[in-house]
Amino acid sequence: MQEDFDEQMMRRAIELARNATGRTSPNPLVGAVVVKEGRIVAEGWHRQAGTPHAEVHALNMAGELARGATVYVSLEPCAHYGRTGPCAKALVEAGVSRVVIAMTDPNPKVAGKGIQILREAGVEVVTGVLEKEAHELNEVFLKWITTGKPFVALKTAMSLDGKIATAGGESQWITNEKSRYQGHRLRDIYDGILVGINTVLQDNPGLTTRLREYQGQNPVRIVLDSQARLPLDSKLATDGAARTIVAVSAQAPASRRAALEAAGLEVLVAGTDKVDVVELMNQLGAMRITSILVEGGGRVNFSLLEAGLVDRVYAFVAPKLIGGSQALTPVEGEGFAQLAQAVELENIQTSLLDNDVMITGRVRRPECE
């Protein structure tokens, strides 16, 4: 059946798109497959912002075979001139006869215009094939392009009884090496990494990506620091390993803000007496930071959850029992007064990492019910 074949080819396009996870920001992940007479003759995916799009890679590989072919693409072909030309026009010029699209592009510069160009040129267009999977593929891009805010993922490592440290503050290491390595792989695919000032004062972290099999990329480091207390001799202020942003309140001493800037750090003011996380996310989104991995403590985590800013959670759970009424948990603060207010996850996935378990899920939104 044609419908089954279309789904099979679209699944391949989505699989190709995933090859560039973490590398295309602020662009979406896109894969394309060219099919002629029932067989794949060319494939492509968007590799990095500013480089050719998936359709162009696939068309270049197909050459003359593109004429009369069907092209499967995981996102509506673009219709505007940016750093590259419009893919919809490239498809028309290549002479393809049919284009199958997983989902329309919500980017206002596209938003149906690519489909319109194709149809006006006489190309048959089919939409909505594996649309749900295509949405999941581009969860980061969709959040950023529709709200202007980064996609926020909260990552935590805890014991089986929900502790992120002992009552005495010891936390290295609760989870095993495989879990920690998976955490570095997450750093590699997010634009930014966010912590609170207390994490910096206690641990002096580098917040860099350390991978064995390939050279990872370091995310932009973001610190919530209402009073600009970040030590000038900390790793974040001295190692030069990555762009570092310190988010302060308007009440932060001007001398401290100036000292941070003199050390080469970027200072963002968001909020009056403490950092307003919603205002901060709007600023970061405007800076084209499309995704943020949060590795903060319980108070930072709760502030983001309470503000409705968290989109995904990664929880690494070790089979250890720590106990202690004063031992810290992944979510502190005032907490939610009623169960109905609790943040619920959906689309849960689990992975076994030796004896540890990684649980991840999307935060359930009321409008999804």
Predicted features, each with a name:
Residues 2-27, 83, 151-152, 158-369:
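Enzymes that bind and transform nitrogen-containing heteroaromatic metabolites
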Residues 13-17, 37-44, 133-146, 235-242:
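A short, flexible N-terminal coil/short beta segment enriched in small residues
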Residues 22-26, 115, 129-157:
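Proteins enriched for Cys/Gly/acidic motifs involved in redox and nucleic-acid/cofactor modification
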Residues 31:
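Helix-turn-helix
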Residues 34-133, 220, 240, 245, ...:
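Zn2+-dependent cytidine deaminase-like catalytic core
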Residues 107-111, 127-130, 145-149, 172-176:
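Short capping loops/turns at secondary-structure boundaries
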Residues 108-109, 135, 301, 323:
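Generic structural signal for helix capping and beta-alpha/helix-loop junctions
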